Every structure is written in structure tokens, then in C-alpha cells.
Swiss-Prot record:
InterPro entries on file: YgfB-like, YgfB-like_sf
Family: Belongs to the UPF0149 family.
Protein name (Swiss-Prot/TrEMBL): UPF0149 protein YE3397
Xref: PANTHER family: UPF0149 PROTEIN YGFB
Gene Ontology annotations for the cellular component aspect, listed alphabetically: cytosol
SUPFAM superfamilies in UniProt: YgfB-like (SSF101327)
């Protein structure tokens, strides 16, 4: 299965957000929508929640609504793809510094946790691998850096953290969106 819906570019989404005076970066908006999808959002209720959290409950104009719909659809498709196609929307390119990417990652993770927490209010009670991943995400959201650090080393470490965050998001999606068997569906061994 190929990913038919593609994410809007970071720059085009930044422009649309700025034009609508929404004080989120594209990374933060993608993190928020990703968190809601990973938390189990399955209907159009995501729009109202995004409006409430980012625009005082007021719906966006079509100029921003359409790119956000595209962002939502592409993200949902990537999360549901068995090939683990999901990627974080973080700025890239020659003009983007490693510090810009680190800041964007922090914003993405913070908003991912916000979106996830809105749909999974008992997040603190989650155990096992998923609980550990959520705890790690909380720590990653607070990571800082020293601008005197070796940028090449920081860039390599950042790529490893981005990959960890990507896998943690997929793990949350699996945990909170896959149907769990109900009691009658769990078969007990039959004694003959």
C-alpha cells in the first residue's frame, strides 16, 4: 500500500498558520494532530479539539482548514500503514540549523503529549513499554542543548532521538487504537 496522501510541506504549513495568526509551528501542529490520532481519535471531532486548543474554539478559514485536513489524512494513513511510514514533520534543509530541529522536536513532542492526553486522560497510569515510552517522551520534551556543543555530534544524537520518538508514537498508536478483545472473546483452554 502506498501513501497516497502526502504531508504539506513545512514551509507551506508555516505560511498558512502565520496567515491565520495561529501561534503554533508546523511541528507543533503535526505533533498535536499525531497525538490525537495515536490517542484514538477516529472521527471529525479532531477539528473542534484543534480549534479549541489553538484558536479559542473558532474554526479556521479554508486557507488553513484544507492544509490541516491534508495533514490529518496523511498522518492517519501513515500511522495505519503496516510499513511504518509515519514520520515527524520537522524542518529540514541546508538553511535549518540543528538547534532549529531540536527546538522543533521539543515542540512536536510537547504537543504530541497534549493531543494524546486529551484523548487518553489516564496517561499517567499506562504501564509496560508504552508507559515507559510516554515517560521518555516527557523527558525528551524537556531536553535542552548547549549552543557550544559539537553540531555534528548533536545532529547525530538528534536523529537518534527523532527515530525513538517516531517509534514511540507508533507504539502509542498501536496501544490506544487497536481493538482489545473483550472477556467473551478471550478463549480459555478447554479441559477434555
Amino acid at each position: 500500500m502506498s501513501i497516497e496522501n502526502t504531508l504539506p510541506t513545512y514551509q507551506s504549513l508555516a505560511l498558512a498558520l502565520n496567515q491565520q495568526a495561529v501561534a503554533l509551528t508546523p511541528a507543533e501542529m503535526h505533533g498535536l494532530i499525531s497525538g490525537m490520532l495515536c490517542g484514538g481519535s477516529k472521527d471529525d471531532g479532531w477539528r473542534a479539539l484543534v480549534h479549541d486548543l489553538t484558536n479559542e474554539g473558532i474554526a479556521f478559514s479554508q486557507a488553513l482548514g484544507l492544509p490541516l485536513q491534508q495533514l490529518h489524512e496523511a498522518t492517519q494513513e501513515a500511522l495505519e500503514n503496516e510499513g511504518f511510514m509515519f514520520q515527524l514533520l520537522i524542518p529540514e534543509g541546508e538553511e535549518v540549523t540543528v538547534f532549529d530541529r531540536a527546538d522543533a522536536l521539543s515542540g512536536w513532542v510537547n504537543h504530541f503529549l497534549l493531543g494524546l492526553g486529551m484523548l487518553q486522560p489516564k496517561l499517567a497510569q499506562v504501564k509496560d513499554e508504552v508507559g515507559e515510552a510516554i515517560d521518555d517522551l516527557r523527558n525528551i520534551a524537556q531536553l535542552g542543548y548547549d549552543e557550544d556543543e559539537d553540531q555534528e555530534e548533536l545532529a547525530q544524537s538528534l536523529e537518534e532521538v527523532i527515530e525513538y520518538v517516531r517509534v514511540a508514537a507508533i507504539l502509542c498508536h498501536i496501544e490506544f487504537t487497536q481493538e482489545k478483545p473483550t472477556a467473551p472473546e478471550i478463549r480459555k483452554p478447554t479441559l477434555h
